[in-house]
Amino acid sequence: MTSQVAAAEVAQPYAQALLSIAQSKNLTEEFGEDARTFLGLLRADKQLHNFFSNPFIQAENKKALIKQILGEGSNPYLRNFLLILVDKRRIAFLESIFQQYLALLRQLNQTVLAEVISAVPLTEAQQQAIIQKVIAISNARQVELETKVDSELIGGVIIKVGSQVIDASIRGQLRRLSLRLTNS
C-alpha cells in the first residue's frame, strides 16, 4: 500500500500533464467529469481499485479493462493517458492522480471544495444556502460540494473548506457546552 505523501508526489506531475493536455485541447471540464466518474468507480468497487494496484496482473489485462470501461466513444487523449499510466506502471496511483487533477482544476476555475457532513441528506435548497455561505466566506467564484451523512451529528452540519471548519452540529454544540461546564 502506498503512503499518501508518496502517492501525492508521484501523482502531481501526471495530474499537471493531464491538465496541460486538457487545456491545450479545451477539454478541462470534460476530463474533470471523467475523473469524477472514475473516482466514483474506484471508491465504489474495491476490486477495481485492487485490480489496478496489483503489480502481478498483466498490463494488457489492465489496458483491456480501461478500454472496456471507457467504451468506444471515449476521449482518445484521456484513454491514451490512462494506457500510458499502465505502461509506466503508475496506474496504481490513478486515484491520487485524478484527485490532484481535480484540485488543479478547482484552482484554475477559482472553485473551492466544501466538504459538508450532515445528520440527514440535504435538500437542494439547503445545499444552495451552504454554497452561498461558502462563497461569502471564501471569496471563491464557485463551490464544489462533497456531501456526507453522519447520523451521530444528531442535527446540523459541519462544513470544511480547506483548513477552516465550521461546526454547526448539535453534537459540536453539546461538546462545547460540556467543555464550558467542566471549565467553570
From Swiss-Prot:
Cellular localization per UniProt:
Cellular thylakoid membrane
Q: State the Pfam families in the record.
A: OSCP (PF00213)
Q: Which GO terms describe its molecular function?
A: proton-transporting ATP synthase activity, rotational mechanism
Q: Which InterPro entries match?
A: ATP_synth_OSCP/delta_N_sf, ATPase_OSCP/d_CS, ATPase_OSCP/dsu
- Keyword Cell membrane applies: no
Keywords (alphabetical) are: ATP synthesis, CF(1), Hydrogen ion transport, Ion transport, Membrane, Thylakoid, Transport
Q: List the PROSITE patterns hit by this protein, alphabetically.
A: ATPASE_DELTA
Provide one Gene Ontology cellular component. Answer: plasma membrane-derived thylakoid membrane
UniProt membrane topology term: Peripheral membrane protein
Q: What function does the entry list? A: F(1)F(0) ATP synthase produces ATP from ADP in the presence of a proton or sodium gradient. F-type ATPases consist of two structural domains, F(1) containing the extramembraneous catalytic core and F(0) containing the membrane proton channel, linked together by a central stalk and a peripheral stalk. During catalysis, ATP synthesis in the catalytic domain of F(1) is coupled via a rotary mechanism of the central stalk subunits to proton translocation. This protein is part of the stalk that links CF(0) to CF(1). It either transmits conformational changes from CF(0) to CF(1) or is implicated in proton conduction.
Q: Which PANTHER family match?
A: ATP SYNTHASE DELTA CHAIN
Q: Which family does it belong to?
A: Belongs to the ATPase delta chain family.
- The name on file for this protein is ATP synthase subunit delta
High-level lineage = Bacteria, Bacillati, Cyanobacteriota, Cyanophyceae, Nostocales
